[in-house]
A protein has these predicted regions:
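Mid-domain Rossmann-like dinucleotide-binding core that forms the NAD(H)/NADP(H) cofactor-binding site
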Residues: 84, 138-223, 228
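Glycine-rich phosphate-binding loop and adjacent beta-alpha segment
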Residues: 194, 211, 248-316, 354-355
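NAD(P)H dinucleotide-binding glycine-rich loop of Rossmann-like/cofactor-binding domains
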Residues: 92-176
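N-terminal Rossmann-like NAD(P) cofactor-binding module of classical short-chain dehydrogenase/reductase
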Residues: 85, 240-243
C-alpha cells in the first residue's frame, strides 16, 4: 500500500515526522493534497499541554487549503484537481446534533473536530476528508490559498464569537484578547453592525490589525483592570456584548463586571489551568442579572466556508493582515509549528505554502 509522510505528535511533549499508509477514500469522501497550511495554538495545547490526552504518532493540523487528489464514487460536486478550502471542523451531517443545529458537536462534545483529534490531521502529504460534498468548499479563482487558509478556523471561530454575542446595530462590544481569533471577532463585530468596539491587548502588530478590522478603542490590560477601564470609558454603562478570546480565569470575572443587563458573554477561548470557572456572584446579580453566557466550537462545513470566502471576494474582510510569517515547502511545517510554540512578539499567524 502507498505510503505518505506527515508531521505528528509522537507522544506528549514530542513531535516528529512519521510515515504512514495512505488513508482509504470512502464512497462519499475525498483525499486532499495540501497547498497551504497553518499551525494553530490548539496544536500547541494538544502536544505540550495534553489538552485531549495522549496520542501516539497522530498527524497534527486542522487548517488547510488543498487540491483534490482522489474522490469517492458517490461524490457529486467535486473532481480531481479542484482546489478546495478545508474547514477545521468536518461534522457528520446526518448525526442528531447536526440536525438540531449543532454540527460541531456531532457524536459527542467537540465531535465535529476530527483532524488531529480522532484521526490524522492535515499536516501530511495527503489527508482524508469525510463527506466531501458537505465538508469541502471550492476555492474562488480570485482568492489565494494562503488567504483562504485563514478561514478554516481563525475567521470561522472568531466570527462565531461575534455571532453568538447577539450583536445588534450600534452595539457596544468588548473583545478580550486580540490574537488571531480575537482579531477575527473584531472583524465579525464590525460586520454585524457594532458601533463602539473595545479591543483588549498590547502587542503593537495586533493593535494595528485590530484598528484595521474595526476596533475603535484599545484597552491595555497592563494599565489596570480592564473592567474598570471599560466602565470608565462608557460612563459606567458597560457593554452590550463581551467576546472572550484570550486571558485567564480571572477574565471571566472582569467580563461579567463590564456586561450590561441583557448582554451576552461569548467565549471562544480554550479554558485551561483550573476545573472551575469563577463568576462574581454579586456582579452577576446572584445569577439573575440577565447576563447570558454563550459557548461554541468553530463552525465547519461547506456552506460556512463558502460564505466566509464571499466576504473576501467582496472586500468585507482581509485575512492577509493576520499572516506575519510565510514558509515555502511542505517540510517547513515543523518550523512553522515551533514558531507558534515559541510565540515571538511579531507573530500573529504563520502560513506554509506547500508547493
Amino acid at each position: 500500500m502507498a505510503k505518505f509522510t506527515g508531521f505528528a505528535m509522537k507522544k506528549l511533549n514530542e513531535v516528529g515526522w512519521v510515515e504512514k499508509e495512505k488513508p482509504e477514500c470512502g464512497r462519499r469522501d475525498a483525499i486532499i493534497k495540501p497547498l497551504a497550511l497553518s499551525p494553530c495554538t490548539s496544536d500547541i495545547h494538544t502536544v505540550w499541554e495534553g489538552a485531549i490526552g495522549d496520542r501516539k504518532d497522530m498527524i497534527l493540523g486542522h487548517e488547510a487549503v488543498g487540491i483534490v487528489e482522489e474522490i469517492g464514487e458517490d461524490v457529486k460536486d467535486f473532481k480531481v484537481g479542484d482546489e478546495v478550502i478545508v474547514p477545521a471542523i468536518t461534522p457528520d451531517w446526518e448525526d442528531e446534533a447536526a440536525q438540531r443545529g449543532f454540527p460541531s458537536q456531532t457524536t459527542g462534545a467537540l465531535g465535529g473536530w476530527k483532524f488531529s483529534n480522532f484521526k490524522d490531521g492535515v499536516f501530511g502529504e495527503v489527508f482524508h476528508v469525510n463527506l466531501a460534498d458537505a465538508n469541502l468548499a471550492k476555492l474562488p479563482e480570485n482568492v489565494k490559498p494562503e488567504t483562504a487558509v485563514m478561514l478554516s478556523d481563525m475567521f470561522s471561530t472568531g466570527m462565531m464569537g461575534s455571532e453568538n454575542a447577539n450583536i445588534k446595530l450600534g452595539s457596544t462590544v468588548a473583545v478580550i484578547g486580540i490574537g488571531p481569533v480575537g482579531l477575527c471577532s473584531v472583524a465579525g463585530a464590525r460586520n454585524l453592525g457594532a458601533g463602539r468596539i473595545f479591543a483588549v491587548g498590547t502587542r503593537p502588530n495586533c493593535v494595528k490589525v485590530a484598528k484595521e478590522y474595526g476596533a475603535t478603542d484599545i484597552v491595555n490590560y497592563k494599565e489596570g483592570p480592564i473592567d474598570e477601564q471599560i466602565l470608565e470609558a462608557t460612563d459606567n454603562e458597560g457593554v452590550d456584548a463581551v467576546i472572550i478570546a484570550g486571558g485567564n480565569m480571572e477574565t471571566w470575572k472582569q467580563a461579567v463586571k463590564m456586561a450590561k443587563a441583557g448582554s451576552v458573554i461569548s467565549n471562544v477561548n480554550y479554558l485551561s489551568g483550573a476545573d472551575i470557572v469563577p463568576l462574581p456572584r454579586e456582579a452577576w446579580g446572584c445569577g439573575m442579572a440577565n447576563i447570558d453566557i454563550a459557548t461554541g466550537l468553530c463552525p465547519g462545513g461547506r456552506v460556512r466556508m463558502e460564505r466566509l470566502a464571499s466576504l473576501i471576494e467582496y472586500g468585507r474582510i482581509n485575512p492577509d493582515s493576520l499572516i506575519t510569517h510565510k514558509f515555502k515547502g511542505f517540510d517547513k511545517v515543523e518550523d512553522a509549528l515551533m514558531l507558534m510554540k515559541d510565540k515571538p512578539k511579531d507573530l500573529i499567524k504563520p502560513v506554509v505554502l506547500c508547493d
